[in-house]
């Protein structure tokens, strides 16, 4: 089995991390998605912060019986530390809405929209947010040659952490006829824009700041580069002219608000080299909380340490009526 694919797990694993506290928080992480390992790493720091803040904490590595486990432990709040399928796509928020358990991060529609690249793109364009040109290619199209002019980007519709993303450059020995659609029957083929990778942390509707990612290895910001120390350098704050930096923050807040996000989010952009034009890539409603993650780094720059960041996220916990 490809470790970067969703796999079905019947039973959740439950571990009590702290037996007393002001409120009982279920920290749901791991799960069945391709981003399972990232979620588990994120949960390590989150669990320590929750205990430090004085909460009773139960860790749940989510399986298909998650509803049964939640009924058994009866938490006051669920901290949704999942990434990818079943957690980031709106499934867990939907369940928690039915169970009327307050939870962190965005709700059903916001999560589902942000997770699906076709629908989020339509939403962005409807709200006059600039994006790169793209087309949708179906496996059944049986395309035998490059669907667009090189260079271009192949993106699975519903994967995060750049899993399955490929950039096809002019000189690459790549035949589209051999592409096997490993993450579903559709992909987005997007115009490759050469430029500076910029990321913005947003918390409760307010942009905390922006950083630039400078690649030290690899040709683009892929899974390996994101989660391997020494593969990329983070320039925080992003070294931009004041007017451009402010525009970046305003655009991020606009995306957050139009998508009706909740709690933390991370907006991603490319600043085209030749024109200084901003192109939105996506908004991530379940940003990582690992030692190399961007939202905690920007929050620290804004004067919010990791423990206080987790406390601010907890304050936003709610369910949708």
UniProtKB/Swiss-Prot annotation:
Family membership noted in the UniProt record: Belongs to the D-alanine--D-alanine ligase family.
Residues holding ATP: 147-199
Tell me if Cytoplasm is a UniProt keyword of this record. Answer: yes
Query: Any idea which positions bind Mg(2+) 1?
Result: 268, 282
Supply the alphabetized keyword list.
Answer: ATP-binding, Cell shape, Cell wall biogenesis/degradation, Cytoplasm, Ligase, Magnesium, Manganese, Metal-binding, Nucleotide-binding, Peptidoglycan synthesis
Alphabetical list of InterPro entries matching this protein = ATP-grasp, ATP_grasp_subdomain_1, D-Ala_lig_Van_CS, D_ala_D_ala, Dala_Dala_lig_C, Dala_Dala_lig_N, PreATP-grasp_dom_sf
Which cofactors does this gene product need?
A: Mg(2+); Mn(2+)
The segment(s) forming the ATP-grasp domain are: 121-315
What gene is it encoded by? Answer: ddl
Q: How is the cofactor bound?
A: Binds 2 magnesium or manganese ions per subunit.
One Pfam match, given by its short name, reads Dala_Dala_lig_C
The chain's coiled-coil residues are none
| Subcellular location field | Cytoplasm
Q: In which pathway does it act?
A: Cell wall biogenesis; peptidoglycan biosynthesis
Task: Set out the biological process GO terms recorded for this chain's protein.
Answer: cell wall organization; peptidoglycan biosynthetic process; regulation of cell shape
Q: What class of enzyme is it?
A: ligase
Reactions accelerated catalytically = 2 D-alanine + ATP = D-alanyl-D-alanine + ADP + phosphate + H(+)
Give the matching NCBIfam families: D_ala_D_alaTIGR (TIGR01205), PRK01372.1 (NF002378)
Which GO terms of the cellular component aspect does the record hold? cytoplasm
Q: In which residues is Mg(2+) 2 bound? A: 282, 284
Q: What is this protein called?
A: D-alanine--D-alanine ligase
